[in-house]
Amino acid sequence: MKRIHKSVVFFACLLLGFTSCQQEKKLPRIGIAGISIECSTFSPATSDEAAFRVKEREDLLDSYPFFAQDSVLRTKAEWFPARVSSATPGGIVTREAYESITKKTLDMLKENLPYDGLYLDIHGAMSVQGLEDPEGDFLQRVRDVVGYETIISTSMDLHGNVSHRLAKN
């Protein structure tokens, strides 16, 4: 009985020792990127790369009100803002513009690999010459860069198109 009592006391002390040790918690690494435009396929105009406003790195992070300098959210992760290109509603995006914007975005995402999570700021109503599912294509290319271990989350307009390819990635 005395032996069991000593074992229980020893185990309790050991357990308290482990639980009282404060280990520095590793923050998740989260990237930010995106392409956002609402296209009208009825418009005769096209949207080229010059139609997009680009925000990168800290300017991108500062552009979101929920990431204000004094925001608690800003301290909950290691943020790696890459690039978001956004345009006002316009005509279909030229294939050249899409390929260029996508390449620049992916190149910036590669700079800080690996990520635990990735926030993609997309609209969901982009049309690109020669592509049936531009957001799905973009997400697939992003997934090819960040891998399948990274959680990808998107925000999009309420009427955005969620294709199977987009949802799968």
Language-model features, listed with the residues they occupy:
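Low-complexity, highly charged intrinsically disordered N-terminal segments
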Residues: 74-80, 84-97, 101-108
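Bacterial N-terminal signal peptides that target proteins for export
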Residues: 1-8
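N-terminal amphipathic/basic leader segments beginning at the initiator methionine
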Residues: 25-72
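Bacterial Sec-dependent signal peptides at the C-terminal "C-region" and cleavage site
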Residues: 12-26
